[in-house]
Amino acid sequence: MTNEKLAVVTGASSGIGKELAKLCARDGYHLIIAADEPAIRQAAEALGSHGVTVEAIEADLATEEGVDRLIAGIGDRDVDLLFLNAGRGLGRGFVDQDWKKVRRIIDTNITGTVYLAHQLGARMARRGRGRILFTGSIAGFMPGTFQAVYNGTKAFIDSFSIALRHELRDTGVTVTVLMPGATKTRFFERAEMMDTKVGTDEKDNPADVAEAGYEAMMDGEEQIISGWKNKLQVAAAHVTPAGTLAEQHRKMAEPVSASKD
């Protein structure tokens, strides 16, 4: 595999990450996929049908030890495409949440993601080429009432990825951030938000979201907001007071809001 094209995808056991991995396999990239659950192995088996080598690494990417395990699995191989997609959500009121759950969201969405970007981004820069895609979110554009921690982490990723892009602009490494809206994955179930309006509303297809992000990355674009409805929502957010956005978000994410229509 030393001389083959290699893509690394985190959070690839389901949802957007799994769809991104499919696109890489379609285009002949050998894959190292990672997630913190055994389902990553089933995902690898399915991807192997595309005729590429797929290695699955089960690792807790919220920890430095888990990220180090992934890096050890990569070894000294050159990474052509890096998809920083692993992430978690958390709904309900901030002060009502167990602190360990809050910390895990921050460590997964920010700490582990940034650590992996630091380690592999440096290798790409020394090599003089590579592409990085962060999965951010349009949630980063608005104060997330009843999703305060999650939206805060995505605001960080949206900002960090664009800053990193401009730091690396002369190295041959491109950085792109994918900003989806609500997508049909296990996100809202895991975040305990199935009694909310946003949790039960119609959502985007993860395959469509992944395709938009993949194409933007391969074209070297700075950012991509997937879906015209999400583009309109972000445009409106830019001219709406933060307090108004926070109240709008409350109506979507407040527990039992699904039963208020």
Question: PLM features: what roles do these ranges have?
Answer:
Residues 27-42:
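Conserved glycine-rich Rossmann-like NAD(P)H-binding loop of the short-chain dehydrogenase/reductase
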Residues 58-69, 99:
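The beta1-alpha1 cofactor-binding region of Rossmann-like NAD(H)/NADP(H)-dependent oxidoreductases
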Residues 177, 197-234:
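C-terminal helical subdomain
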Residues 93-106:
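Substrate-binding pocket helix/loop in short-chain dehydrogenase/reductase
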Residues 137:
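Residue(s) in the substrate-gating loop at a strand-loop-helix junction
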